[in-house]
């Protein structure tokens, strides 16, 4: 990961879809993507983007995606992704909202945690501060699952955020605390 600022590449960046991956090989684009916290850099001339990152960059007109020598439009790529991941739209909405607010957003740490989130300016110099778990409004979330996710986030010394997406695609963020599930809730003060 490059900590120095790189000059912007010529937009839109050209990317290729190969099976489940989206990759960029233009050096200038790779440098810019890496400096902004997008994707995983394998070499000087290769960044692999996660699907939600590619969707976001496509929605910002910063990325053109091709597959088998044909351009894939946003909706076409989304339909392909939805076949394999029923939560991709939810993840994309949360990712977009957080990026638009200035956060750097990366893949989560397992336990169904969708993202790890860096404060603005912290990416590359400090660890992620938050873990985000996305859920559609009205979707049941068992207390034990929530408890296990919370325990996992605390074991990583991260703050857990539950991102709830309603049917209008509006997102409400809830910060969870161990106090909610600790001794205080059982009356053992």
Each language-model region and where it sits:
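Long Lys/Arg-rich low-complexity intrinsically disordered regions in nucleic-acid-associated proteins
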Residues: 1-189
